[in-house]
Amino acid sequence: MSDVVDRGGAWAVVGAGPHGLSALKNLLELGLDADGFERDTDLGGNWNFHAENSRVYESTHLISTKPFTQFPDFPMPDAYPDYPSHWQVHRYFRSYAEHFGLFEHLHFNSEVVSVTPAPGERWDVTVLDRSTGETATRQYAGVVIANGHNWWPKIPQYPGQDTFTGEIKHSADYKSAEVVRGKRVLVVGAGNTGCDVAVESAQNAKETYHSTRRGYYYNPKYAFGRPSDQTADLLLALRLPLALRRVMFKSVLRLTVGDFEKFGLRKPDHEFFETHPIVNQQLVYYVGHGDIQPKPDIDRFDGSTV
């Protein structure tokens, strides 16, 4: 390792996903020098489909619309649809970096392996060049950590799981419908990814079952002819009491989607706004057509059965 290089008043930004890019851009706008470090060969973080630990799959689209996703000082192109694909989102981030001159401050294939305090309220940042295997340490006035949270997949454990004769895959390893094509599939979990995978499985697998521990509010992407987050924004602008807002949102959901229990889905055991929103236009549709069969939480595994 070489001697420590003092970068004076410069800041280091760890990660070149959306938060890392915006942090780098704002530091530069404040007149500060800054270096951005990204372990992959391109920016975008989770939205870079080809990145080593990207969790997006071929069919991934935003669950929020352009006005609620784009940077306020750099709108998404007018030609983009309401819910852009991950390819479009990644192109947007590259355009953002080009527009604000960020590429000259970004270091790719550069993995930050340690950040340690240094005398004088400074920070030593050690970076591994993944192309050469060499490390170098630079000292900064400050560090912004923007390396994301979708890194290590967690698979729950159930009794008898080690006896299961089928495949067990985490959604982190799901990239396309080829994973489920022609198979009997059980999708576990009703987060946005779980719902997306269940829908793709319904379209491509032999049979699809969907196991959830609880009921959820499955919000449509469109309500009353417009994107649902824009409809929701109109209701939120009324600044009504929380209890009344919950009544209104559940009423809108019942009018636009229906009674979940009549579809065989479990009744939510929590109130609106108490969990991360599930936005999926198609899950209830495929449940209603019998292509997705709702199931409760897993109790145990037994050989080839669950």
What do these predicted regions represent?
Residues 2-62, 75, 81-222, 226, ...:
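Flavin (primarily FAD) cofactor-binding/catalytic cores of flavoenzymes
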Residues 60-70:
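Catalytic lobes of large eukaryotic enzymes
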